[in-house]
Amino acid sequence: QIVVGNGGKQLIFNALLASIDPEDEVIIPTPYWVSYPQIVNFAGGKSILANCTESNDFKISPKLLEKLINKKTLWLILNSPGNPTGSVYSKRELHDLASVLRNHTNVNIICDDIYSKIIYGNKKFFTLAEVAPDLIDRILIINGLSKAYAMTGWRIGYAAGNLSLIKAMIKLQGQSTT
């Protein structure tokens, strides 16, 4: 249920390319890492930008998430700590988002945790999988070594998730990078 790749970007690319059908939607909280919408578009999906404001520390609220989910929603991308804001979802915030996601079994979650070891102040990192283990079959965790260990040129990332998705990602990676 794990695949290693050439950085988190390749793994997000592989996951979306392996799973998105035309017209599938991906919810992306703003501000966002520049590549998310481009990867979604390349995979044939539609990016749904969730306008997250400074008043909520640039994090998606359960209310906004509920408003944006529909039958076409395939993925939610959660980046915590966030790039470019550094915003970190608390355990309570993740719990509240999980409460919404439990009602929408069509929605999978990419937890881009690449900055999990780079946190400032007294904030603590949690990933959705530890807060809501009942959603584990719908969660894809993305992480890597480059950011946490100052190895930016090494491009070593890993993804952990549902076995069928991981197998599809491995198949795609085997045809594109070996």
Describe these PLM feature segments.
Residues 18-40:
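Conserved PLP-anchoring active-site segment centered on the Schiff-base-forming lysine
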Residues 53-122:
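Active-site phosphate-binding strand-loop segment of PLP-dependent enzymes
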Residues 5, 50, 128, 142:
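Hydrophobic residues at beta-strand termini and immediately following loops
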Residues 132-178:
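Conserved core segment of the aminotransferase class I/II
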Residues 30, 49-53:
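Short beta->alpha connector loops at strand-helix junctions that form conserved
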Residues 24, 45, 101-108, 136-137:
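A short helix->loop->beta-strand "cap" motif at the edges of active sites that frequently abuts
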Residues 1-25:
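Phosphate-binding glycine-rich loop
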